[in-house]
Design a protein with these regions (language model features):
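Phosphodiester-processing cores and adjacent nucleic acid-binding clamps
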Residues: 1-189
Length: 189
């Protein structure tokens, strides 16, 4: 059943917007290995390292789904962390077309309604957009209230990797979503 973020000990983004703490919202755990072998780190290991670093916010953002929300919530409570929930979704132009090509996109809930929106579109992606992976398209993405989620371009598998239509896509996202970001990754050693 859909429960509220508050019930899960969740985090409203206003709780951290004025703090200067680094929050790793885009990380994966061993739960992402359902479809893509991406990470062997367990959430317990993240918690241990987060305590060493003095972090106070844990996220559950996995490939194609929100991850083990209940388990992460239990760990958050045990470690006195706040929790945020998101998904690294698979974005396609049309979820009804059977084509394995996709782009990654991160959706992070800013509030309880954002959490419900992510649950809703990912459920629909599994029902009507599943082709090897649950895929979302503009119809699902733009059905989300733009005030309820943070959207980022994810990683090297995101939409920015394809030059054709890149600028138009960025503007479309920026013009709809109130919090749309293009992350910067360090590639230096």
């Amino acid at each position: 059943s859909v429960n509220t973020l508050k019930k899960f000990g969740g985090l409203e983004m206003s709780d951290i917007q004025h703090e200067k703490e680094y929050v790793n919202y885009h990380k994966h755990s061993h739960y992402s290995n359902i479809r893509t072998i991406d990470c062997i780190t367990k959430m317990e290991d993240y918690c241990d390292r987060m305590k060493e670093l003095g972090h106070t916010v844990i996220s559950t953002v996995e490939h194609g789904y929100q991850g083990n929300v209940h388990g992460t919530n239990t760990l958050a409570k045990q470690n006195n962390f706040k929790m945020i929930v998101g998904v690294e979704a698979y974005y396609v132009p049309d979820r009804y077309v059977k084509d394995r090509r996709n782009f990654h996109i991160i959706l992070v809930a800013k509030n309880t309604n954002g959490y419900k929106d992510i649950n809703r579109i990912m459920s629909e992606a599994n029902r009507t957009g599943f082709y090897y992976k649950p895929r979302i398209d503009d119809e699902l993405l733009f059905s989300i209230n733009p005030n309820n989620i943070i959207v980022t371009t994810a990683c090297v598998a995101g939409r920015l990797r394809e030059e054709q239509g890149r600028k138009e896509w960025i503007l479309k996202m920026k013009n709809y979503f109130k919090t749309y970001y293009l992350p910067i990754y360090s590639t230096s050693e």
